[in-house]
Amino acid sequence: MARQRAAFGSVPRMNPLPKFQLKLWGTRGGLPVSGPQFQKFGGNTICMEMRCGEHVIMFDAGSGALSAGHALAAEGCKELTLYFTHSHYDHIGGLPFFKPLYCGQSSLKLWSGHMGSAMTTRQMLSEFMRKPFFPIGPDYCSAGIDARDFTAGDVLTPYPGVTIRTGMLNHPGNAVGYRVEFGGRSIAIITDTEHEPGTLDPAVLRLIDKVDLFVYDATFLDEEMATFKGFGHSTWQQAVRLAQAAGAKQVGFIHHSFNRTDAELTKIERAAKRQFPGAFCGRDFQVIEV
């Protein structure tokens, strides 16, 4: 059958790109905070939800996982994949309260790649959810849980058309950075990494090369780095330098210090935008589409 021609003067309908977005459920590092001085940017620890078309991919499960889990359960989400950057408390503390774990019809794949041969993802989950630290273990969860492991540097394909590139970051106990490619676009997750002043980490540059969006560990300020050397974190100024060097389109600052107030983060965001217009401070519940 011949393709119908568009009417004279009309514009042929283009197929829209599939949805590719990142939702920030938690943007703090260290521990959750609350109070009037934290209302604009929020106080939940790291948890992110990515939509690649119909597929749901989570990154980390800090305290933001509580709200994320309730929203996904209400939506009727039955299948998702969760990748851990690492297993410090502010990145896994919300996992036992993640509602899809307790939905019998749900299927979850949990992945980690920062521990090498020291511990598997399954062992990490079992060690975290056990007495005397927690009243129940993973066996109480009624969802189907498939715990898997990878090695930093591996390229993963969790769903058709979705490619995830991984790389090791500079953090005590290790952490993994991710670059997700879907529909000709890319988003990178770079949290919990310490830079050496005056240098740009080649592993980070590879993950963020010409990326549409990356979120980055901005716990400290450049002038604070000497005081906190060895803590495993970076700065918003380094994020801007990386974005400029890599040809990135947008960079979002995450892993805000639990001491950083709304007024301070607003000041940081304004200063960053003067240097790189695509920079912003991430906020709890913010959605960014690429």
Give, region by region, the residue ranges found by the protein language model:
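Short strand-loop junctions, especially beta-strand C-caps/beta-turns
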Residues: 113, 192, 256-257
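Cap/insert and terminal regions of metallo-dependent hydrolase folds
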Residues: 186, 196-284
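Binuclear metal-dependent hydrolase catalytic cores
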Residues: 3-188, 199, 204, 266-290
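Active-site flanking residues adjacent to catalytic metal/cofactor-binding acidic residues
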Residues: 59, 85, 190-191, 216-218, ...
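Generic low-polarity alpha-helical segments
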Residues: 1-11, 236-243
